[in-house]
Amino acid sequence: MPLSPPAIYPHRAHVPVLISVPHAGRDYPDWLIALCKGGAQALHALEDPLVDDLVEGTVDKGIGAVIARTPRAAVDCNRAEDEIDPTVIRSGPIASLSARARGGLGIVPGRTAMHGPLWRQPIPRHEL
């Protein structure tokens, strides 16, 4: 079940800046939408919509950027690999949960404020 790689724009300007856009991914594979209780609409609630479009002008000027194409619903690039919500990922016992994972915002988000729990069933860890 491959996910889209990020768009990487090399640095070509004379300023030491790299822009990261981790939550703008909108390449939703059909299988991801099918796993979600609320469908695509529920998954869109996790996006930072159109931030990637805002960055395009800086990329045109040579500023480096890494722009996620994979949606945050599939993987949150701002989470550590051990920030696992056990209600989302079947992984066996977890020694301690981060506050974000306990709140449903682990490496694979488990809920949104508007839609509640996202997934029809837990995802096996080997699928990560």
Language model feature labels by segment:
Residues 1-128:
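N-terminal catalytic or cofactor-binding beta/alpha core of small enzyme domains
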